[in-house]
Amino acid sequence: MKKGMFLLTIITTILVSCSHKQKTSPKPFGYIRIDFPQHRYKLFDSASFPYAFEYPIYAKIEKDNDVNTEPFWINIYFPKFMARIHLTYHKINNNLDTLLDDSHILVYKHTVKADNITAKDYTNDSMHVYATLFTLEGNAATPFQFHIMDSTKNFVRGSLYFHVRPRYDSLYPYISFIGEDIKHLIETFRWK
Protein backbone atom coordinates (compact mmCIF):
# COMPACT_ATOMS: atom_id res chain seq x y z
CA MET A 1 0.00 0.00 0.00
CA LYS A 2 2.77 2.42 0.92
CA LYS A 3 4.64 1.55 -2.27
CA GLY A 4 1.53 2.19 -4.35
CA MET A 5 0.87 5.52 -2.64
CA PHE A 6 4.49 6.62 -3.14
CA LEU A 7 4.40 5.62 -6.83
CA LEU A 8 1.08 7.44 -7.32
CA THR A 9 2.55 10.60 -5.74
CA ILE A 10 5.62 10.49 -8.01
CA ILE A 11 3.55 9.95 -11.16
CA THR A 12 1.12 12.73 -10.20
CA THR A 13 4.00 15.13 -9.52
CA ILE A 14 5.59 14.37 -12.89
CA LEU A 15 2.31 14.78 -14.77
CA VAL A 16 1.43 18.03 -13.01
CA SER A 17 4.88 19.53 -13.55
CA CYS A 18 4.85 18.66 -17.26
CA SER A 19 1.32 19.89 -17.90
CA HIS A 20 1.99 23.62 -17.24
CA LYS A 21 2.59 25.57 -20.38
CA GLN A 22 5.18 28.22 -19.75
CA LYS A 23 5.01 31.41 -21.68
CA THR A 24 8.36 32.15 -23.27
CA SER A 25 9.31 35.48 -24.71
CA PRO A 26 12.53 36.64 -26.30
CA LYS A 27 14.84 38.63 -24.11
CA PRO A 28 15.26 42.24 -25.16
CA PHE A 29 18.64 43.39 -26.43
CA GLY A 30 20.80 44.91 -23.74
CA TYR A 31 23.45 47.47 -24.48
CA ILE A 32 26.23 48.64 -22.24
CA ARG A 33 25.89 52.28 -21.35
CA ILE A 34 29.06 54.10 -22.30
CA ASP A 35 29.52 57.58 -20.90
CA PHE A 36 32.02 59.28 -23.17
CA PRO A 37 33.58 62.53 -22.04
CA GLN A 38 33.13 65.69 -24.08
CA HIS A 39 35.70 66.20 -26.84
CA ARG A 40 37.94 68.90 -25.36
CA TYR A 41 41.59 69.39 -26.17
CA LYS A 42 44.83 70.84 -24.89
CA LEU A 43 48.05 71.70 -26.70
CA PHE A 44 51.13 69.49 -26.71
CA ASP A 45 53.97 71.88 -27.46
CA SER A 46 57.17 70.69 -25.82
CA ALA A 47 60.06 73.09 -26.52
CA SER A 48 62.41 70.28 -27.53
CA PHE A 49 60.00 68.62 -29.97
CA PRO A 50 59.89 69.50 -33.70
CA TYR A 51 56.09 69.27 -33.77
CA ALA A 52 53.00 70.34 -31.83
CA PHE A 53 49.35 69.25 -31.84
CA GLU A 54 46.19 69.22 -29.75
CA TYR A 55 45.21 66.08 -27.87
CA PRO A 56 42.23 65.21 -25.62
CA ILE A 57 42.19 66.36 -21.99
CA TYR A 58 41.21 62.81 -20.94
CA ALA A 59 44.44 61.40 -22.42
CA LYS A 60 48.02 61.49 -21.14
CA ILE A 61 51.27 62.02 -23.03
CA GLU A 62 53.87 59.39 -22.14
CA LYS A 63 57.46 58.94 -23.24
CA ASP A 64 57.85 55.78 -25.31
CA ASN A 65 59.91 53.39 -23.18
CA ASP A 66 60.51 50.76 -25.84
CA VAL A 67 64.10 49.52 -26.26
CA ASN A 68 64.25 50.85 -29.83
CA THR A 69 62.85 54.27 -28.96
CA GLU A 70 64.28 57.23 -30.80
CA PRO A 71 64.04 60.93 -29.90
CA PHE A 72 60.56 62.49 -30.06
CA TRP A 73 58.70 59.16 -29.87
CA ILE A 74 55.69 59.41 -27.56
CA ASN A 75 52.45 57.66 -26.70
CA ILE A 76 49.07 59.24 -26.16
CA TYR A 77 47.45 57.05 -23.51
CA PHE A 78 43.67 56.83 -22.96
CA PRO A 79 43.39 55.21 -19.50
CA LYS A 80 39.58 55.04 -19.51
CA PHE A 81 39.55 53.17 -22.84
CA MET A 82 42.71 51.06 -22.41
CA ALA A 83 44.00 52.49 -25.68
CA ARG A 84 47.22 54.08 -26.83
CA ILE A 85 48.30 56.05 -29.90
CA HIS A 86 51.96 55.37 -30.67
CA LEU A 87 53.71 58.30 -32.37
CA THR A 88 57.11 57.83 -33.97
CA TYR A 89 59.19 60.62 -35.48
CA HIS A 90 61.80 60.38 -38.23
CA LYS A 91 63.97 63.01 -39.84
CA ILE A 92 63.76 62.83 -43.64
CA ASN A 93 67.23 62.32 -45.14
CA ASN A 94 66.58 61.39 -48.77
CA ASN A 95 64.49 58.49 -47.43
CA LEU A 96 60.92 59.74 -47.83
CA ASP A 97 60.07 56.88 -50.21
CA THR A 98 61.32 54.34 -47.67
CA LEU A 99 59.35 55.96 -44.83
CA LEU A 100 56.16 56.01 -46.92
CA ASP A 101 56.70 52.41 -48.07
CA ASP A 102 57.25 51.28 -44.47
CA SER A 103 54.10 53.10 -43.40
CA HIS A 104 52.05 51.41 -46.14
CA ILE A 105 53.56 47.99 -45.35
CA LEU A 106 52.62 48.37 -41.69
CA VAL A 107 49.06 49.28 -42.67
CA TYR A 108 48.56 46.51 -45.21
CA LYS A 109 50.07 43.87 -42.92
CA HIS A 110 46.61 43.84 -41.35
CA THR A 111 44.75 42.76 -44.51
CA VAL A 112 44.53 39.24 -43.06
CA LYS A 113 42.12 40.43 -40.33
CA ALA A 114 40.83 43.73 -41.76
CA ASP A 115 37.58 43.63 -43.72
CA ASN A 116 38.25 46.98 -45.37
CA ILE A 117 41.03 49.58 -45.45
CA THR A 118 40.34 53.15 -46.53
CA ALA A 119 42.68 56.11 -46.79
CA LYS A 120 41.86 59.80 -46.39
CA ASP A 121 44.34 62.56 -47.22
CA TYR A 122 44.65 65.78 -45.22
CA THR A 123 46.47 68.83 -46.58
CA ASN A 124 47.33 72.10 -44.89
CA ASP A 125 49.62 73.93 -47.32
CA SER A 126 50.05 77.00 -45.11
CA MET A 127 51.48 74.83 -42.27
CA HIS A 128 53.24 72.36 -44.63
CA VAL A 129 51.29 69.48 -43.13
CA TYR A 130 50.44 66.55 -45.39
CA ALA A 131 48.80 63.50 -43.83
CA THR A 132 47.08 60.25 -44.70
CA LEU A 133 44.72 58.54 -42.25
CA PHE A 134 44.10 54.82 -42.79
CA THR A 135 40.93 53.32 -41.32
CA LEU A 136 41.02 49.56 -40.84
CA GLU A 137 37.63 47.92 -40.35
CA GLY A 138 37.31 44.44 -38.88
CA ASN A 139 39.26 42.58 -36.23
CA ALA A 140 42.64 44.07 -37.10
CA ALA A 141 45.00 44.83 -34.22
CA THR A 142 44.84 48.54 -35.03
CA PRO A 143 41.76 50.42 -36.27
CA PHE A 144 43.67 53.59 -37.29
CA GLN A 145 47.12 54.30 -38.65
CA PHE A 146 48.37 57.56 -40.10
CA HIS A 147 51.43 59.43 -41.19
CA ILE A 148 52.10 63.16 -41.22
CA MET A 149 54.94 64.89 -43.05
CA ASP A 150 56.15 68.18 -44.40
CA SER A 151 57.58 66.28 -47.43
CA THR A 152 61.11 67.64 -46.97
CA LYS A 153 62.40 67.31 -43.38
CA ASN A 154 59.98 65.66 -40.95
CA PHE A 155 57.85 62.50 -40.80
CA VAL A 156 55.56 61.25 -38.01
CA ARG A 157 53.77 57.92 -38.02
CA GLY A 158 50.93 57.04 -35.66
CA SER A 159 48.86 53.98 -34.84
CA LEU A 160 46.06 53.29 -32.37
CA TYR A 161 46.07 50.11 -30.30
CA PHE A 162 43.63 48.86 -27.67
CA HIS A 163 45.02 46.70 -24.87
CA VAL A 164 42.30 44.12 -25.33
CA ARG A 165 41.59 41.43 -27.90
CA PRO A 166 40.39 43.14 -31.11
CA ARG A 167 36.66 42.61 -31.51
CA TYR A 168 35.52 45.27 -33.92
CA ASP A 169 31.82 45.16 -33.08
CA SER A 170 32.47 45.49 -29.34
CA LEU A 171 35.14 48.17 -29.74
CA TYR A 172 33.28 50.16 -32.40
CA PRO A 173 31.91 52.88 -30.06
CA TYR A 174 35.43 53.44 -28.67
CA ILE A 175 37.01 53.34 -32.12
CA SER A 176 34.56 55.97 -33.40
CA PHE A 177 35.11 58.18 -30.37
CA ILE A 178 38.92 58.06 -30.48
CA GLY A 179 38.78 58.37 -34.27
CA GLU A 180 37.42 61.90 -33.82
CA ASP A 181 40.39 62.68 -31.57
CA ILE A 182 42.84 61.36 -34.16
CA LYS A 183 41.25 63.51 -36.87
CA HIS A 184 41.53 66.53 -34.55
CA LEU A 185 45.19 65.70 -33.87
CA ILE A 186 45.92 65.62 -37.61
CA GLU A 187 43.97 68.82 -38.29
CA THR A 188 45.79 70.75 -35.52
CA PHE A 189 49.25 69.28 -36.18
CA ARG A 190 52.02 71.75 -36.99
CA TRP A 191 55.77 71.67 -37.51
CA LYS A 192 58.10 73.97 -35.58
Task: Place the predicted regions along the sequence by residue.
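Secretory pathway targeting signatures of secreted, lumenal, and periplasmic proteins
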Residues: 48-101
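Signature of long, low-cysteine stretches enriched in small and polar/charged residues
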Residues: 102-159
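C-terminal motif of bacterial Sec signal peptides marking the signal peptidase cleavage site
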Residues: 14-17
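Positively charged n-region of N-terminal signal peptides that target proteins for export
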Residues: 1-4
